[in-house]
Design a protein with these regions (language model features):
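Membrane-proximal, lumen/periplasm-facing interface regions of secretory-pathway glyco-
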Residues: 37, 321-329, 352-411, 418-434, ...
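Specific aromatic-rich, kink-prone transmembrane helix
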Residues: 95-97, 136-155, 162-170, 336-339
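Short helix- or helix-capping micro-motifs
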Residues: 114-122, 170, 174, 188
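Short acidic/glycine- and proline-prone juxtamembrane loop motifs at membrane-interface regions
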Residues: 126-137
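Transmembrane-lumen/periplasm boundary regions of multi-pass, lipid-linked membrane glycan transferases
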Residues: 172, 184-297, 302, 309-314, ...
Length: 522
């Protein structure tokens, strides 16, 4: 009987992985069809540039997501589709964490519906395509919650191992983004709402987790000390010196309803106990939408686990402690769908009856996403959307070709200039080229300096945007001044590049200015 149950549970798990994998692959395919470039802010190129070195920090963010990017592209080719695959593998790991959390909380019947509902939320679909410091938390926070819950509940060797996992995963979350401190504060507060959680504090387990957490962060803390707390200075610049930005507070307050609108509406529509008629379901819908967010008493662990990251962030923003940013809301909703279903379901049967329907809808949704993507690509092409036509690949090819023509006996080793758009040369061109922010001997490049840069061939790249709508930038002037100060020629090299191929019916030229750095030979 035990063997039969094991086989059954394994089959269920593989089925869940298959469904979530289908979600991931459909979005990878859709983004690969609809988009001709990675994100317009070059965040993903920035990750790639940081990931070229294994460092314990940077001038902007802690390092873990850059490590992940670097390891990924040491295995996979530097193409957009591979990047989207990383993004949605991250989503799949997060949804599996939500599934496991539901099981840990004794809500196994809600596990699959909760995961399937979340895949319709924007952070797990459209926004998830951009892999960065915010989106990596989608895969980390649920597993931290799982480890915490088992550390509280399990005794003996299992409890010790889960406590080690809690400390390790918490350290990884902090090494991904310091904003995880808000989530960990929420975990600490949640532990006090139940008798089991309070008892946990008088056992050695939380202190073991804290020890592992500290050891995991120690190399990063040492790096910070050696680099004049540079990352913390960047964080402090995000503070609220100018007072509370109530517009951002209001936007962040609405984030749960905005980012998770579709699954919220759907869960309140589908889970209507008693199998009511269509009109009964419709008239009771507003009441169920409100019920989704309600606690079941002050000791409701699930409610506080789901809501505290959002609430704590909101308090920090309202008090002016930080200036809120809407993308911070991306990871906060990992427990929302589980909370909704728990509140709406009068009995497990109420949810189990909707699971088959959700599976069918999910498959249909995945098919729809893929079918819509060619239309969206055509629409962007027809409208002449600037980001659709940015010729990153073609620019990398032309820039490398031009360098070889100008400097046939000198290998290009590094590229500086406009961060992080300059990383296109390494990502789409030659992965051996080191990307530096700005110029190699000034901040922020000096935080993780490139050895012997002055003895190597380098290029300074300044994208100027489309010819008909050039961007306003002082990049060329800054690069010329730096070259002159280093005894180099500051003669600009102008380049016009356009995206090529059947996907680009319009010819929209983009301007680039480059400068060569040639080592001075004795």
């Amino acid at each position: 009987l035990d063997d039969k149950n094991t086989v059954t549970s394994q089959g269920v798990f593989y089925g869940v992985v298959g469904l979530l994998g289908l979600h991931a692959l459909s979005w990878v395919l859709a983004h690969s069809i609809a988009n001709t470039n990675l994100d317009s802010y070059a965040d993903m190129l920035e990750n790639y540039a940081w990931g070229q070195k294994f460092a314990w920090g940077s001038a902007k963010h802690p390092p873990f997501f850059a490590w992940v990017t670097g390891i990924w592209f040491s295995i996979f080719p530097t193409v957009d589709t591979a990047y989207y695959l990383l993004s949605f593998l991250n989503v799949t790991l997060g949804l599996l964490g939500v599934y496991r959390l539901a099981q840990a909380l004794g809500l196994s019947s809600l596990a699959l519906p909760a995961a399937l509902l979340l895949r319709m939320a924007f952070p797990y679909s459209t926004l998830a395509a951009k892999f960065n410091a915010n989106s990596i938390l989608l895969s980390l926070w649920p597993w931290v919650a799982v480890a915490w819950w088992y550390s509280v509940r399990e005794a003996g060797r299992s409890g010790w191992l889960w406590s080690v996992a809690l400390g390790l995963l918490s350290a990884v979350a902090m090494l991904s983004k310091y904003y995880s401190g808000v989530f960990l504060l929420g975990i600490f507060l949640v532990a006090w709402v139940s008798h089991e959680g309070r008892h946990w504090f008088v056992t050695p387990k939380p202190w073991l987790a804290l020890l592992v957490f500290g050891l995991g962060l120690l190399p990063h803390l040492q790096w910070l000390q050696a680099h004049d707390l540079v990352t913390l200075r960047y964080i402090s610049e995000q503070g609220g010196d100018s007072g509370t930005d109530w517009r951002q507070v209001f936007k962040f307050a609405l984030a749960p309803m905005a980012y998770w609108l579709l699954p919220w509406l759907l869960s309140a529509w589908l889970v209507a106990p008693g199998q009511p008629s269509f009109m009964q379901r419709l008239t009771g819908w507003p009441q169920r939408l409100v019920r989704c967010w309600l606690p079941q008493g002050w000791d409701d662990t699930l409610f506080w686990l789901a809501m505290l990251p959002w609430l704590i962030t909101l308090v920090f923003g309202a008090t002016g402690f930080v200036q809120l940013s809407l993308p911070w809301a991306i990871p906060v909703g990992f427990g929302f769908s589980l909370l909704w279903l728990r509140n709406l379901a009068a009995a497990p049967a109420d949810v189990s009856q909707i699971a088959p329907r959700l599976r069918r809808w999910m498959i249909g949704w995945c098919i729809l996403v893929v079918l819509v993507s060619p239309w969206y690509a055509w629409y962007q092409a027809k409208q002449g959307a600037t980001h659709f036509y940015v010729p990153r690949r073609e620019a990398a090819t032309e820039l490398l070709k031009g360098w070889e023509e100008r400097q046939p006996d000198l290998r290009l080793r590094w590229v500086g200039g406009a961060w992080a758009e300059n990383a296109l040369l390494a990502f789409y061109g030659d992965a051996s080229i080191q990307v530096v922010p700005g110029v190699p001997d000034q901040f922020p490049a000096s935080v993780s300096p490139l050895a012997d840069w002055h003895q190597q061939g380098g290029m300074l790249l300044c994208p100027l945007g489309p010819l008909d709508k050039p961007v306003q930038t002082d990049c060329p002037q800054q690069m010329q001044a730096w070259l002159q100060a280093h005894g180099q020629s500051s003669e600009p090299i102008h380049l016009t590049v356009a995206s090529q191929g059947w996907r680009f019916p319009k010819r929209i030229g983009f301007a680039y200015v480059v400068f060569d750095y040639v080592p001075i030979r004795p």
